[in-house]
């Protein structure tokens, strides 16, 4: 587990460049900085893969929280916006951040006045859904919590302006609201919440959010998000409160896909994801080696299931690229063999075997779901290397039999073509 305590979190300038990423196993992903601000175009709470593992769209950017207690207002939002001249405007909610942890899921812990709040996020496995669990302990008088979801709909490497973010937007029956993008009327972005009340916002657009890494790369780095509602909650005096917030994207239909969550629904879903990562650590066999187990979890972020084959593949260039053949074969041993994911390794070899054309392994599956591109001469040679590495590590008769039946004919085809 990566764990960063409060004394290392206060510096906005340094920590906005320290980042986390988590994925959902079908090409979707989430990411941000460890202080809660977005730092790149390719970040947000839910970048959904509409045709796994490609066609990736940002649909849910982040949430901003604000606590009120008596005359005190605690703005937990951490963000950077473009200012006049060269000086950005920074909202520094990280001053209330006491802990950040990441182990396949991420958790931000805050302390403000008499209130302690944990905000825990996870992507559900093989689903374009994010779960957020809030656990709040109020040790003082009655308080209030406001959560502002920032929504979007754009290709994950693009940016949005107000004119791009036009939606049909309505409250739904599951405690949140539903968005249908004008740019994709067949899709529905659905947000649900276990409690709270919806309040329409006067200012429905968060404009000129600035991504520092994009600025460092000499682009404007500006983006706009749609925030139609605040969710508001009462935190009784001397109480503990649990809140579940979920967001998903799916084809338009008459009824919500999500049911209204219970207070602990998100926490239960997050626990399932944590159990998944625990099982990967156990399978890898590194025992109590914390560093090795961190690498096992990190390796999983690059593996995804491809719809066109129903098999596993590797997104070695995440988030920028999809399953490029050359990069996949180079990363193959570290991501699957060193982690003892032998079944996934076989599927990855078979995925690329199915796309060999005139002896060439595809070098690129385009992000828009078009036919693969064959534009590298050495990906096929790296494929031989990956097959050899697989047999050296596994070495069982059944493994040799699998390669002989499913892969060897393709190897012969490659040799003949070369």
List where the protein language model places each region.
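Terminal accessory carbohydrate-recognition/targeting modules of carbohydrate-active enzymes
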Residues: 1-284, 319, 326, 337, ...
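Short glycine-rich loop/turn motifs
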Residues: 105, 297-300, 315-319, 349
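Aromatic-rich carbohydrate-recognition surfaces in CAZymes
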Residues: 138, 160-162, 322, 326-328, ...
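Extended, well-ordered alpha-helical scaffold segments
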Residues: 146, 257-280, 291-298, 340-354, ...
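Active-site-adjacent bridging/hinge elements
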Residues: 210-218, 298-312, 352-362
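Structural motif
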Residues: 287-292, 323-326
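Internal amphipathic alpha-helical repeat/solenoid segments
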Residues: 309-328
